[in-house]
């Protein structure tokens, strides 16, 4: 009997202790979850991070382009190294972006000094104080009576004269910039217009407004009590974060849209209205990479008659346009099928026909599986395509006043 009672008491104590331990573990788990929920992982990555102060010139980075147009370290001769500091991905990314801004300015210099292009400010009637964008044009872009070539890049950080920043930094200037296209076009008698579809806004530092208060309806608490509560919470957060990081405060920025150029589509339309369409050239040719293809289709939807009357051919490279989503009319789809060719990323040899995704623009292989390389890899084929398109148009114009649908059909066997 005594043994049973003792066993019962022991069991009761054991269960109670287990419950207490479980409760203690549960409380610890809850506390840990609460702790983790308040830790900003991005902030933790800033721990012991070096200052985000980077050089403003290529010389400062100790890099330069060699005779082959490759970016190399001036002391070691090595290519660019992204992981300059191990386990500091955010810092390395910021360093890469800082170098990218320098590259953008470098390409602008090459466009002006080597390609003899001049900058045209947008909007054309911009006031001194409003945000502005720009494009680059050759001296004869508006006066060339024969033909002009228009270059439109994809979306993202790339600016006028660039196809892909990654290629410029890691490969060479030929593959990553539009300079080879510009030089070849000028050699063949084209005027040139280089668009800048991603320069859509002016970035300025955001100025905080201390007078800006929360809406009176946001809370039933008295304003004074709410402010004291927020102050206490903010102090707690600050004290908490200080344990985990060496803070680097980044400036908070805001973007002021550029009038009538607030998106790639707007920019392309504006450039057409104020520059491309005002050119004296009878024949217009367009190279559009990635999102640039979508911007061109949008242009055609808005200026169909004008485009059809003057654009002889469009070379797209891995274009992301979609005639269904963009609601392009059947007449536009028919025109694209006759006057456009899309060089897409593919393992097939260059210029090999690729199954069409939609019944609008013929697709051929760019001879590479890398999206950003499609423009460079199809360089020779694009100029041949334009030459054939112009010859077909001139033959049709001289032989008959009536142009048949088949006369402009892309002859892939000619590539």
Swiss-Prot record:
Main localization (coarse): nucleus
Species in which this protein is naturally found: Danio rerio (Zebrafish)
Taxonomy of the source species: Eukaryota, Metazoa, Chordata, Craniata, Vertebrata
Annotated function: May play role in the regulation of alternative splicing. May have hydrolase activity.
Protein's GO biological process: mRNA processing; regulatory ncRNA-mediated heterochromatin formation; RNA splicing
Listed name of the protein: Cotranscriptional regulator ARB2A homolog
Biased composition (Basic and acidic residues): 204-215, 222-242
Record's keyword annotation contains DNA damage: no
GO CC terms, sorted: cytoplasm; nucleus
Region (Disordered): 204-242, 392-415
Keywords, in A-Z order: Cytoplasm, mRNA processing, mRNA splicing, Nucleus, Signal
């Amino acid at each position: 009997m005594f043994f049973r009672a003792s066993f019962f008491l022991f069991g009761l104590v054991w269960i109670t202790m287990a419950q207490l331990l479980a409760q203690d573990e549960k409380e610890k788990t809850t506390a840990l979850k609460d702790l983790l929920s308040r830790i900003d992982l991005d902030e933790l990555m800033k721990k012991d991070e070096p200052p985000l102060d980077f050089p403003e010139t290529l010389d400062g980075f100790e890099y330069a382009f060699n005779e082959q147009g490759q970016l190399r370290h001036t002391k070691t001769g090595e290519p660019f190294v992204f992981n300059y500091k191990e386990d500091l991905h955010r810092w390395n990314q910021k360093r890469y972006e800082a170098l990218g801004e320098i590259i953008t300015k470098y390409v602008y210099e090459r466009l002006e000094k080597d390609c003899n292009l001049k900058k045209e400010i947008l909007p054309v009637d911009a006031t001194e104080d409003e945000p502005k964008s720009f494009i680059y044009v050759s001296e004869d872009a508006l006066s060339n009576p024969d033909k002009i070539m228009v270059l439109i890049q994809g979306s993202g950080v790339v600016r006028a004269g660039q196809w892909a920043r990654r290629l410029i930094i890691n490969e060479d200037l030929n593959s990553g910039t539009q300079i080879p296209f510009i030089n070849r076009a000028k050699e063949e008698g084209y005027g040139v217009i280089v668009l800048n579809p991603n320069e859509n806004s002016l970035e300025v530092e955001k100025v905080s407004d201390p007078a800006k208060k929360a809406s009176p309806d946001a809370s039933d608490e008295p304003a004074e009590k709410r402010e004291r509560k927020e102050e206490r919470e903010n102090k707690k957060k600050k004290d908490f974060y200080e344990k985990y990081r060496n803070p680097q405060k980044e400036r908070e920025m805001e973007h002021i849209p550029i009038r009538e150029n607030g998106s790639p589509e707007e920019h392309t339309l504006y450039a057409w209205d104020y520059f491309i369409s005002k050119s004296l050239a009878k024949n217009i040719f367009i190279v559009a990479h990635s999102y640039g293809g979508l911007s061109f289709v949008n242009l055609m939807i808005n200026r169909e008659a004008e485009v059809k009357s003057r654009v002889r051919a469009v070379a797209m490279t891995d274009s992301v346009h979609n005639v269904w989503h963009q609601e392009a009319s059947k007449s536009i789809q028919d025109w694209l099928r006759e006057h456009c060719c899309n060089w897409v990323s593919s393992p097939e040899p260059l210029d090999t026909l690729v199954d069409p995704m939609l019944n609008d623009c013929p697709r051929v292989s760019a001879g590479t599986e890398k999206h950003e390389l499609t423009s460079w890899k199809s360089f020779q084929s694009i100029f041949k395509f334009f030459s054939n398109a112009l010859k077909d148009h001139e033959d049709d114009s001289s032989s008959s006043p009536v142009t048949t649908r088949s006369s402009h059909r892309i002859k892939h066997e000619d590539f």
